[in-house]
């Protein structure tokens, strides 16, 4: 019995050690399996070495919608502008009516007399221009009504006059600048010199030399020592020396680099 107990005691630690070793080995295998990169899995393909982006071409349906949108875009914008203009006009008119109603509901004390003065002045202008031309029929009532309004509302009339004068001045300055720019442009174009035709000018030092010579001496002519030395020095500095006889005179001509020519008499 004692031997059996000792055997059990010796076998239990060995079993525990084996179990712990197997568990540790299993954990290491699991950790190794978890450290695998996603690119190394068989479900992924190797990326190409050289890739190029290709833009997707629009189809027929997309091109059709684009052409319709571009064709109707300007008309839609014009309709939107008209709608906004009409809407703002209606809103301003409604607001003006509301303000006028509130003002007329509780008018100040001097409102009715002032309106009476303006109305009477306008009617007086209409009556005075009854037998006149159309211009008088328009200007007389407006002028007298404006005069009556100026008398009744001097402060507002001064403000309106200042604003109108500023607008007129700005418009006149713009017109003056446009006319001035056109005038300066036209004056600059007129002041520019016209291109002249190229003319061939001959210098006064150029002298025409006849191509034909009467007679060229083939035999040598004895020259004095001074002239021979000059001829030698000139022949050294030039490329051509030609001696000709014209009318009993011996003429020596040098090349183009020599300015003087020698004349000898026999």
From Swiss-Prot:
Mitochondrial intermembrane side: 28-110, 156-266
Annotated localization: Mitochondrion inner membrane; Mitochondrion
Boundaries of the annotated transit peptide in chain numbering: 1-27
GO-annotated cellular components: MICOS complex
Topology, Mitochondrial matrix side: 130-137
Pfam families: ApoO
Main localization of the protein described in the UniProt heading: mitochondrion
GO biological process, alphabetically ordered: cristae formation
Subunit architecture: Component of the mitochondrial contact site and cristae organizing system (MICOS) complex, composed of at least MICOS10/MIC10, CHCHD3/MIC19, CHCHD6/MIC25, APOOL/MIC27, IMMT/MIC60, APOO/MIC23/MIC26 and MICOS13/MIC13. This complex was also known under the names MINOS or MitOS complex. The MICOS complex associates with mitochondrial outer membrane proteins SAMM50, MTX1 and MTX2 (together described as components of the mitochondrial outer membrane sorting assembly machinery (SAM) complex) and DNAJC11, mitochondrial inner membrane protein TMEM11 and with HSPA9.
Function recorded in the entry: Component of the MICOS complex, a large protein complex of the mitochondrial inner membrane that plays crucial roles in the maintenance of crista junctions, inner membrane architecture, and formation of contact sites to the outer membrane. Specifically binds to cardiolipin (in vitro) but not to the precursor lipid phosphatidylglycerol. Plays a crucial role in crista junction formation and mitochondrial function.
Protein family membership: Belongs to the apolipoprotein O/MICOS complex subunit Mic27 family.
The name this protein goes by in its record: MICOS complex subunit MIC27
Organism: Pongo abelii
Organism phylogeny: Eukaryota, Metazoa, Chordata, Craniata, Vertebrata
């Amino acid at each position: 019995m004692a031997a059996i107990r000792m055997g059990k005691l010796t076998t239990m630690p060995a079993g525990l050690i084996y179990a712990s070793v197997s568990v540790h080995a299993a954990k290491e295998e699991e950790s190794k399996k978890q450290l695998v990169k996603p690119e190394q899995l068989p479900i992924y393909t190797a990326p190409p070495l050289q890739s190029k982006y290709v833009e997707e071409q629009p189809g027929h349906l997309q091109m059709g919608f684009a052409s319709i949108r571009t064709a109707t875009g300007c008309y839609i914008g014009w309709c939107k502008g008209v709608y906004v203009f009409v809407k703002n006009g209606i809103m301003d008119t409604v607001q003006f009516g509301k303000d006028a109603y509130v003002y007329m509901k509780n008018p100040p004390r001097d409102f009715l007399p002032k309106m009476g003065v303006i109305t009477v002045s306008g009617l007086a202008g209409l009556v005075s221009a009854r037998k006149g031309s159309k211009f008088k029929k328009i200007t007389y009532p407006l002028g007298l009504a404006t005069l009556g309004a100026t008398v009744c509302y001097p402060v507002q009339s001064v403000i309106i006059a200042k604003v109108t004068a500023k607008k007129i001045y700005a418009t006149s300055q713009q017109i003056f600048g446009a006319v001035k720019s056109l005038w300066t442009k036209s004056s600059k174009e007129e002041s520019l010199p016209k291109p002249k035709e190229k003319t061939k000018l001959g210098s006064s030092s150029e002298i025409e030399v006849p191509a034909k010579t009467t007679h060229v001496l083939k035999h040598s002519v004895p020259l004095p020592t001074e002239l021979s030395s000059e001829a030698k020095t000139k022949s050294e500095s030039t490329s051509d020396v030609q001696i000709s006889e014209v009318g009993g005179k011996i003429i020596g001509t040098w090349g183009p680099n020599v300015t003087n020519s020698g004349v000898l008499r026999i």
